[in-house]
Amino acid sequence: MADARKAALDTALKKIEKNFGKGAIMRMGDAAQTTISTISSGSLALDDALGVGGYPRGRIVEIYGPESSGKTTVALHAVAEVQKQGGTAAYIDAENALDPVYAEHLGVNIDDLLLSQPDTGEQGLEIADALVSSGAVDILVVDSVAALVPRAEIEGEMGDAHVGLQARLMSQALRKLSGTLNKTKTIALFINQIREKVGVMFGNPETTPGGRALKFYATIRLEVRRAEQIKEGTNIIGNRVRIKVVKNKVAPPFKRAEVDIMYGQGISQTGEIVDMAAEKDIVKKSGSWYSYGDDRIGQGRENAKKYLDEHPDVMAEIRQKVRDAYGMDQTGEEDDQADDKSKDKATKPSDKSQAQAKPKKPVATETSLDLDDSKTDK
């Protein structure tokens, strides 16, 4: 009986491959899909909260929150990180509000950044689809979903009712994009705004525009909110921002990261290093004083940050210890071994695919993926 079932299965598999092509169906052990490639978010604290060391490649990420909370800053840091490691980034600026000077201060190479400011939502999403389909883009940012206005609404009169147009547009676009993103291993970052439901008496009245499709298709959803202001005397020089991982299909969700977003500078690297080093006792905190080894580096958090800014050698040393303590550098030999194992299992690739498999640019790292999505919110 067992042999008959096996023969029937083999016949079915051969028929599927004949009708739909080789690779249409395979055993997961043969496909070697047990690892997921990631790109750093540009923030150590956020990389740790994401659980896999960054944004997973080939997936959709939604970043939402109130106005001026730091959503665009978080996205631009990911763009800068991709470019820093030799990747290509594209930015769909539907809001027509991207500040190139600020982006450059965050480390974005604006000369190489692909920028589009579409007239309609349909045009913006078609451009996004074309860029992703090319297979040459590592990260695509759409800023923002709320600004992807359907053509019918733009060409219509003020006051005309256009119920559900944007939701249908997003649903159709995401159905097309999700498969292409997975094949090309492009990260799609969708920035979104917040709206309030009218008449909600109990529960959270907040919602995001664009319908439910993005909530379902997103592998990761990040909620970005200002926690408090950062002051220097009476001057406000930045904001303390909380980033909550509301949904995560590749690691446990609901983790949080707190970062300092300084005006004109973006996420403070020294701020997160001070916090993370203190949490692991790499930097000792006694009262209001911070100490590293036998040296006191500052009284109060802001003074400790200034010390690290002024001593880049100490900063680099502590940063490396933080990465080691949080397990962020365990991608070298282990990933090479994983690649070797997957090559042994897979069919011998062509010369072209072998060239693509070589690590020409260290844009991505790989992390083990828990394939059981039943524990996560889909």
Swiss-Prot record:
It comes from the Bacteria. Residues 339-351 have a biased composition (Basic and acidic residues). GO terms for biological process: DNA recombination; DNA repair; SOS response. Keywords: ATP-binding, Cytoplasm, DNA damage, DNA recombination, DNA repair, DNA-binding, Nucleotide-binding, SOS response. InterPro entries: AAA+_ATPase, DNA_recomb/repair_RecA, DNA_recomb/repair_RecA_CS, P-loop_NTPase, RecA-like_C, RecA-like_N, RecA_ATP-bd, RecA_C_sf. Residues 325-378 are annotated as: Disordered. It is found in: Cytoplasm. GO terms for cellular component: cytosol. ATP binds at G65, P66, E67, S68, S69, G70, K71, T72. Its main location: cytoplasm. GO terms for molecular function: ATP binding; ATP hydrolysis activity; ATP-dependent DNA damage sensor activity; damaged DNA binding; single-stranded DNA binding. PANTHER family: MITOCHONDRIAL DNA REPAIR PROTEIN RECA HOMOLOG-RELATED (PTHR45900:SF1), RECA (PTHR45900). Can catalyze the hydrolysis of ATP in the presence of single-stranded DNA, the ATP-dependent uptake of single-stranded DNA by duplex DNA, and the ATP-dependent hybridization of homologous single-stranded DNAs. It interacts with LexA causing its activation and leading to its autocatalytic cleavage. Belongs to the RecA family. This is Protein RecA. It comes from Lactiplantibacillus pentosus (Lactobacillus pentosus). The lineage of its organism: Bacteria, Bacillati, Bacillota, Bacilli, Lactobacillales.
